């Protein structure tokens, strides 16, 4: 039985899971949920995932949500390249730290700044813009450490962070103050180009950015 992924194509967390699945050759049964119309609140989905969020993975009865957990699970269960999520606990801890930085800081500040406009048509908050710039500055400093975000090789942290930063880029946030971030992002794009980057991530990022721009004009 093929693992089932409940998702929405433009969602950044969903895109990261789709990119990894493509990279490691995992076939997923895709079930789209339109969260803008409340499809995630249907009783059968709430029964599956009480938090009723996407992405949600159902792999033979093992139900997981939170995209970064799903990334780690898919590599552990199906991946052949140990480098994507190292087994060495010290190396893995760095990958985990970057994933948590993405979840709790960088991506969260993207959501805080842009999503009130996307969802409610609210005006942009300059304080939240400054907080996003601050998080990008921290990431810029982190990139001094390794050739990639968490190691001297590509990991699942790069996938998660690439989706976040490419979405920031699609929103036309000024990335010029962050040369390491820009160079790293281009490396990620090159690495993922043969794994559906354009159709999965670039298209989704532009869809979400287009929705943002349309709300901004209202």
Swiss-Prot record:
Entry keywords, A to Z: Transferase
N-terminal signal peptide: none
Function: Conjugation of reduced glutathione to a wide number of exogenous and endogenous hydrophobic electrophiles.
Gene Ontology annotations of biological process type: glutathione metabolic process
Cellular component, GO annotation: extracellular region
Record family assignment: Belongs to the GST superfamily. Theta family.
Origin species: Anopheles gambiae (African malaria mosquito)
Database matches in Gene3D superfamilies: 1.20.1050.10, Glutaredoxin
EC number: 2.5.1.18
Organism lineage string: Eukaryota, Metazoa, Ecdysozoa, Arthropoda, Hexapoda
Alphabetized InterPro entries for the sequence: Glutathione-S-Trfase_C-like (IPR010987), Glutathione-S-Trfase_C_sf (IPR036282), Glutathione_S-Trfase (IPR040079), Glutathione_S-Trfase_N (IPR004045), Thioredoxin-like_sf (IPR036249)
Protein name: Glutathione S-transferase D7
All copies of domain GST C-terminal, residue ranges: 88-207
GO MF annotation: an example: glutathione transferase activity
Gene: GstD7
Binding positions for glutathione per the UniProt entry: 11, 52-54, 66-68
Catalytic reaction(s) noted: RX + glutathione = an S-substituted glutathione + a halide anion + H(+)
């Amino acid at each position: 039985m093929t693992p089932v992924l409940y998702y929405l194509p433009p969602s950044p967390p969903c895109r990261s899971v789709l990119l990894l699945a493509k990279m490691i050759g995992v076939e997923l049964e895709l079930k789209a949920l339109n969260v803008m119309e409340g499809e995630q609140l249907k009783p059968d989905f709430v029964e599956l995932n009480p938090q009723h969020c996407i992405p949600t993975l159902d792999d033979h009865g093992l139900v997981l949500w939170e995209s970064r957990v799903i990334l780690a699970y898919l590599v552990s269960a199906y991946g052949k390249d140990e480098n994507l999520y190292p087994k060495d606990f010290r190396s893995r801890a760095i990958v985990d730290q970057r994933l948590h930085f993405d979840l709790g800081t960088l991506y969260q500040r993207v959501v805080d700044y842009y999503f009130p406009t996307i969802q409610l048509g609210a005006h942009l908050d300059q304080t939240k813009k400054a907080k996003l710039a601050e998080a990008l500055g921290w990431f810029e400093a982190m990139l001094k450490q390794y050739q990639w975000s968490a190691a001297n090789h590509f990991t699942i942290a790069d996938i998660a962070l690439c989706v976040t930063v490419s979405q920031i880029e699609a929103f036309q946030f000024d990335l010029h103050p962050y040369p390491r971030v820009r160079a790293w992002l281009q490396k990620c794009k090159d690495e993922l180009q043969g794994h559906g980057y354009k159709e999965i991530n670039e298209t989704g990022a532009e869809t979400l950015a287009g929705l943002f721009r349309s709300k901004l004009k209202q």
